């Protein structure tokens, strides 16, 4: 026994790294696999959801960045004219840029949410259980903020591609290069402040609503796992509440992002808000396109949450085989 202890001490003195205990290795492997599952599930969820509503999203952005009055009839006319002029797939123009941004954004957001839930659960003594309301709201806000900070330039590029003719920019890299060269690198973060101000309530309320509805459902029905259509409905409610709360800041963000190609000189959040209200009014300016968002948003968020949950469940089942 004494010889074994001396051998281990001698090995440590020579700088040799002793093997980690099997339990510690297993725990680290499980944690890494959990993070990977969240990243993959989040990326897939974001891609499916955004592709499903891409034509509506593009139409909404075009109205947001112009002073033209919005109506469902005008939105339909714009979609139809685009289809006649440029073809069916032109309705998905800018979707490649959307995917470049949405896949990492959704992956980071969903993964960060799982991590923040664990951290806050441990801090508040609710590890492995549903979080209380305030930490539940905080976890969502932190997750959205983390994802927005990391992926914001991609959102800027996506907005530019959505509102410009296809002849103006040939591909995503062309947008990056030309914005950097012609307008400066700082332009890639134009509109960042209203984005963060909007993400905090949007992500917080979206995740909070979805998690709360799942918790209430489990308590009322005794089923820990809702059916897919129930997850879709919970996600749709979450999207409706989250997007309605943050919508004016979304309009401000789009105006600031596309200022370089629309002829305006929006520079600050308050200045942009004042100009929009002065020219178009509060409802027709800051809430332009909200009715379309009430269609698009719940569908996208519902699909996103449902896809994330079901993909995670599927991945866990495969790992048990």
UniProtKB/Swiss-Prot annotation:
InterPro entries: GDC-like (IPR002167), Mit_carrier (IPR002067), Mitochondrial_sb/sol_carrier (IPR018108), Mt_carrier_dom_sf (IPR023395). Solcar repeats lie at residues 33-119, 131-216, 226-314. Pfam families: Mito_carr. It is found in: Mitochondrion inner membrane. One of its GO terms (biological process) is AMP transport. It comes from the Eukaryota. Disruption phenotype: Morphant embryos show morphological anomalies including dorsal curvature and bent tails, severe muscle disorganization, early motor defects, and mitochondrial abnormalities. SUPFAM superfamilies: Mitochondrial carrier (SSF103506). Keywords: Membrane, Mitochondrion, Mitochondrion inner membrane, Repeat, Transmembrane, Transmembrane helix, Transport. The chain crosses the membrane at residues 35-55, 91-111, 137-154, 191-208, 232-252, 295-315. It is a multi-pass membrane protein. Mitochondrial carrier mediating the transport of coenzyme A (CoA) in mitochondria in exchange for intramitochondrial (deoxy)adenine nucleotides and adenosine 3',5'-diphosphate. Belongs to the mitochondrial carrier (TC 2.A.29) family. This is Mitochondrial coenzyme A transporter SLC25A42.
